[in-house]
């Protein structure tokens, strides 16, 4: 099946907004086994939109239009598609009720006649309810071509796609089952090299590597009758892949850390902290609180994290953490001594089970004769204080800080997994 995405809106063409819907929809279609062959952006112009719809209908089986469902005159998507399909626009009862409920709480003058357009669907469509907005979406098949209309705002589009469109398409088309494997500590080029025979000879399941910032994912996919068969096929392939070794001889399973498109090292670490009822603190220099803010972004973070320190300068490291200033000057802030001292003092001062520290050179200039991207990460527990040195070269300041936090979370994760193996 060939799909085409059409983004409607002059603001996309003028660069006022970024078309993030295209990426989201492409991922969702891939999960369903639907191939997106074309992506188009067109302005709020009926003639040009008609031309784009005509072209899409000649080359695609599924046409998804995003944007242009609002109440204003330049919101033309449903009207133009209805004209192309030679169908009337009718009112969806549920969408009309939502308009009534919405404006019942507002001044009567706020409900202008053009608002009613948002409750219209093309005659013969399956309405796609909009839980977070007023403009109803729709799905219709005419002459073997399926058309979808969706609102433009991502906050409205995503719930409709996840809760309405994906289940609808799943019933109509064969389902693609996928499993995403996540790796940290290996680059995409090496991972592809190690698995080259699998990738070059793949049929079903398929293997698709993706490079992320600081990590790599593999999407394993198969088309089959049900989830149980898919789990069996994907599980067998996963076991074969993870049995391979890196070019350094390290088991690939050692750099694999979890599953899922929306998973992360931080989430895996947080869940282990909760599982083992361990508290954590941090003292951060170059990352300036990024580790702690990431940790605090998870609901329930207060179970494991009460607070920490941001000590950017040498003087603040001495003042807030109680580290000897002369020793800091002697060893330098970019050193194992400083990283270990920061982690241990943070742990002792807060009473946490685990203390983490990050200190180094975000760049672009050198510091203490250390190149940009040099980072020391400390970790302290009741039984041990240690540190690692990593070099994150050729990256921006933001990437250096982000990847440094990944290393820190991975260090904590491995420590907690050792605890798990002892139980």
From Swiss-Prot:
SUPFAM superfamilies: CinA-like (SSF142433), Molybdenum cofactor biosynthesis proteins (SSF53218). It holds the Pfam family CinA. This is Putative competence-damage inducible protein. It comes from the Bacteria. InterPro entries: CinA, CinA-like_C, CinA_C, CinA_KH, Competence-induced_CinA, MoaB/Mog-like_dom_sf, MoaB/Mog_dom. Belongs to the CinA family.
């Amino acid at each position: 099946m060939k799909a085409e995405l059409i983004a409607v809106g002059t603001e996309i063409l003028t660069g006022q907004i970024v078309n993030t819907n295209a990426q989201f929809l492409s991922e969702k279609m891939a999960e369903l086994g639907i191939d997106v062959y074309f992506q188009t952006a067109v302005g709020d112009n009926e003639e040009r939109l008609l031309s784009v719809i005509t072209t899409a209908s000649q080359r695609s089986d599924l046409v998804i239009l995003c944007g242009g469902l609002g109440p204003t005159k330049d919101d033309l998507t449903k009207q133009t598609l209805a004209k192309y399909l030679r169908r009337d626009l009718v009112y969806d009862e549920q969408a009309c009720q939502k308009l009534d409920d919405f404006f019942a709480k507002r001044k009567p003058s706020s409900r202008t006649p053009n608002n009613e357009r948002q409750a219209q669907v093309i005659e013969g469509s399956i309405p796609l309810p909009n839980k977070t907005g007023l403009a109803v979406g729709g799905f219709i098949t005419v002459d073997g071509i399926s058309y979808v209309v969706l609102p433009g705002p991502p906050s409205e589009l995503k719930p409709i796609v996840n809760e309405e469109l994906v289940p609808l398409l799943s019933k109509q088309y064969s389902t693609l089952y996928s499993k995403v494997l996540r790796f940290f500590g290996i680059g995409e080029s090496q991972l592809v090299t190690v698995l080259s025979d699998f990738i070059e000879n793949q049929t079903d399941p398929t293997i698709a590597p993706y490079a992320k910032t600081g990590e790599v994912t593999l999407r394993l996919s198969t088309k089959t009758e049900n989830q149980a068969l898919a789990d069996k096929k994907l599980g067998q392939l996963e076991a074969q892949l993870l049995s391979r070794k890196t070019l350094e001889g390290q088991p690939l399973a050692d750099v694999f850390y979890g599953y899922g498109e929306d998973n992360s090292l931080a989430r895996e670490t947080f869940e282990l902290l909760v599982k083992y009822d361990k508290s954590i603190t941090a003292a951060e220099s170059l990352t300036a609180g990024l580790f702690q803010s990431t940790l605090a972004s998870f609901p329930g973070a207060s179970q494991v994290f009460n607070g920490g320190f941001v000590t950017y300068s040498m003087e603040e490291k001495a003042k807030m953490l109680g580290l000897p200033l002369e020793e800091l000057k002697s060893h330098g802030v970019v050193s194992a001594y400083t990283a270990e001292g920061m982690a241990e003092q943070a742990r002792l001062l807060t009473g946490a089970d685990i203390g983490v520290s990050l200190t180094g050179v975000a760049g672009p200039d050198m510091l203490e004769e250390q190149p940009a991207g040099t980072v020391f990460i400390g970790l302290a527990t009741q039984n041990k204080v240690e540190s690692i040195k990593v070099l994150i070269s050729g990256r921006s300041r933001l990437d250096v800080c982000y990847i440094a936090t990944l290393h820190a979370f991975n260090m904590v994760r491995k420590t907690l997994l050792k605890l798990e193996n002892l139980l």
